[in-house]
């Protein structure tokens, strides 16, 4: 075993600890809560310091969003499918999004397509980030080489794009427990992501934000995920952005009642004469019933159970009783019970009504053991307020592009955390034509920006735009042959001066030729862009 100078070892450790403490004093972290210490972080680092490009990209992203939030403007983007799309997006948009939905359907690391259930291997989205980030680096090198080898008097005619737009990627629910979240975060940092978002659904039952049947985890469990992301990023020395998504606006189930902050939104049965639903269903199955018969039994039980939130059960008890000043009693109860656990709310209700109100959250539990839950905008606000100290941005998944709802959410969050940056999904799952007029569509992003939604994105625009042009071209090509290619693809490319019209140059053939010439002393008989290359036809 190698001998160790313990004094030097401890000195280096303390120097690193002090460096982390100094890092955390940066204004970047002025709203960030860390329930761990710099000593704990440094102790989990190796002795070889690695500088990750992700850190540069994260700092760049933070600067963009800080400026947007302060100016009440917006950085908006959409889900990128592959490098061709990336190189066109960077001309006009300042961030790039990588969608788990798109990756699930088109880029699983098993090559098995799937809907957005996050049942693909956890390296799927990081691999897509890596593909795009490597393309960014390559096209940036290609552009620099072309510019620096062009005389200054002609250089203004050479493109000068920022290929290194920060990438924000979908981490779904983290693909497992907290160690999985940390490993997934590590993958994203290693692959070049500037930020990731993680949602508060349960991993085994995760659904697309616009599917039914979503099951939440308790608030505390999702906070642990956010802390795990920050801890892993800190271990790696990066400013990676963590975006907290809540699916609570439309959720109907939750895994546990352990967190008192969830209690106000849990549902319970108010009919004491009914046996628990699961007991009834097990007995029905054992008697030979199945399928539609079981569904009918469950529907009948639900209809009789009087399922509601505890607050509503208290309000109904007061309204149905012989109390004087019912409105005053209701307001008194709601004020006193706000933010309290169910046991505390029960005691408050008994003190006001003089009775124990029957309300049982175990009775309606599902066969999977989940508790029933009533989401909504205020439910999402409740969760967002809890997540805010641990998240750089917060996103509420919603059913519709509803400005009034978006304002209610933003106002609710900013009443507690006025500095909180927000994100918004401009989802293709919405019927935009039915939702608003063309004039409203034109201003929707800007109007949301005024509310603090400084980062907005169309998750699947890459998928849909690819499908549309593919359908248009395939249909025309089948009928018109090469005329379709000329009219629908090549001529519009040339008119718009899309760089990929000269696809050999776009792919970096010149860069590779020059690299070969460099290592062969300037002579190469196999240059890809030499005499005979067909792209000479496109020179004006």
UniProtKB/Swiss-Prot annotation:
This is Isocitrate lyase. Substrate binds at residues 99-101, 209-210, 245, 425-429, 459. It comes from Talaromyces marneffei (Penicillium marneffei). Mg(2+) binds at residue 170. It is found in: Glyoxysome. Pathway: Carbohydrate metabolism; glyoxylate cycle; (S)-malate from isocitrate: step 1/2. GO terms for molecular function: isocitrate lyase activity; metal ion binding; methylisocitrate lyase activity. Belongs to the isocitrate lyase/PEP mutase superfamily. Isocitrate lyase family. The gene is icl1. GO terms for biological process: glyoxylate cycle; tricarboxylic acid cycle. It is an enzyme of class 4 (lyase). Its main location: other. Catalyzes the formation of succinate and glyoxylate from isocitrate, a key step of the glyoxylate cycle, which operates as an anaplerotic route for replenishing the tricarboxylic acid cycle. Required for growth on ethanol or acetate, but dispensable when fermentable carbon sources are available. Also acts on 2-methylisocitrate. The active site is at residue 208. Its EC number is 4.1.3.1, 4.1.3.30. SUPFAM superfamilies: Phosphoenolpyruvate/pyruvate domain. Homotetramer. GO terms for cellular component: glyoxysome. It catalyses: D-threo-isocitrate = glyoxylate + succinate; (2S,3R)-3-hydroxybutane-1,2,3-tricarboxylate = pyruvate + succinate. The keyword Glycoprotein does not apply. Keywords: Glyoxylate bypass, Glyoxysome, Lyase, Magnesium, Metal-binding, Peroxisome, Tricarboxylic acid cycle. It holds the Pfam family ICL. Its cofactor is Mg(2+). InterPro entries: Isocitrate_lyase, Isocitrate_lyase_ph_CS, Pyrv/PenolPyrv_kinase-like_dom, Pyrv_kinase-like_dom_sf.
């Amino acid at each position: 075993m190698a001998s160790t100078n313990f004094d030097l070892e401890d000195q280096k450790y303390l120097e690193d600890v002090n460096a982390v403490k100094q890092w955390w004093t940066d204004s970047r972290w002025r709203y960030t809560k860390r329930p761990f210490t710099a000593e704990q972080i440094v102790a989990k680092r190796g002795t070889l310091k690695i500088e990750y490009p992700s850190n540069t990209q994260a700092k760049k992203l933070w600067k963009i969003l800080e400026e947007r939030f302060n100016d009440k403007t917006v950085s908006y983007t959409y889900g990128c499918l592959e490098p061709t799309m990336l190189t066109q997006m960077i001309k006009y948009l300042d961030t790039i999004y990588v969608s788990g939905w798109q990756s699930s359907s088109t880029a699983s690391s098993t090559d098995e397509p799937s809907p957005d259930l996050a049942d693909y291997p956890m390296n799927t989205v990081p691999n897509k980030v890596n593909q795009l980030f490597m393309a960014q680096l390559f096209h940036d090198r290609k552009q620099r080489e072309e510019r620096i080898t062009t005389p200054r008097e002609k250089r203004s005619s050479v493109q000068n794009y920022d290929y290194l737009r920060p990438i924000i990627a979908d981490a779904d629910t983290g693909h497992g427990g907290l160690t999985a979240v940390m490993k997934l975060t590590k993958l994203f940092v290693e692959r070049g992501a500037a930020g990731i978002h993680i949602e508060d659904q349960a991993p085994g039952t995760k659904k697309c934000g616009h599917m039914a049947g979503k099951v939440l985890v308790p608030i505390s469990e999702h906070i642990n995920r956010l802390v795990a992301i920050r801890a892993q990023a800190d271990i790696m020395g990066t400013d990676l952005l963590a975006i907290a998504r809540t699916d609570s606006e439309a959720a109907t189930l939750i895994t546990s009642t352990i967190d008192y902050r969830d209690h106000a939104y849990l549902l319970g049965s108010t009919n004491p004469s009914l046996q628990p639903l699961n007991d009834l269903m097990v007995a029905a199955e054992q008697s030979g019933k199945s399928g539609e018969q079981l569904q009918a039994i469950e529907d009948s039980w639900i209809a009789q159970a009087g399922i509601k939130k505890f607050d509503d059960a208290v309000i109904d008890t007061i309204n149905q009783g012989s109390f004087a000043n019912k409105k005053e009693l209701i307001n008194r109860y709601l004020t006193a019970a706000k933010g309290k656990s169910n046991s505390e709310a029960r005691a408050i209700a008994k003190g006001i009504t003089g009775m124990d109100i029957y309300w049982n959250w175990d009775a309606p539990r599902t066969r999977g053991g989940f508790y029933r839950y009533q989401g909504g905008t205020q439910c999402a606000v409740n969760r967002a307020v809890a997540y805010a100290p641990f998240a750089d941005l917060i996103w509420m998944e919603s059913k519709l592009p509803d400005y009034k709802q978006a304002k209610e959410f933003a106002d609710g969050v900013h009443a507690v955390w006025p500095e909180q940056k927000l994100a918004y999904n401009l989802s293709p799952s919405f019927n935009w034509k039915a939702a608003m007029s063309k004039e409203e569509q034109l201003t929707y992003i800007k109007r949301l920006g005024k509310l603090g939604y400084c980062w907005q994105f169309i998750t699947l625009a890459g998928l849909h735009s690819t499908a549309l042009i593919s359908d248009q071209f395939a249909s025309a090509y089948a009928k018109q042959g090469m005329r379709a290619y000329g009219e629908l693809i090549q001529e519009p490319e040339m008119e718009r001066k899309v760089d990929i019209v000269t696809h050999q140059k776009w792919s970096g053939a010149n860069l590779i030729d020059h690299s070969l010439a460099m290592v062969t002393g300037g002579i190469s008989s196999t240059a890809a862009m030499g005499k005979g290359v067909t792209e000479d036809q496109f020179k004006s």
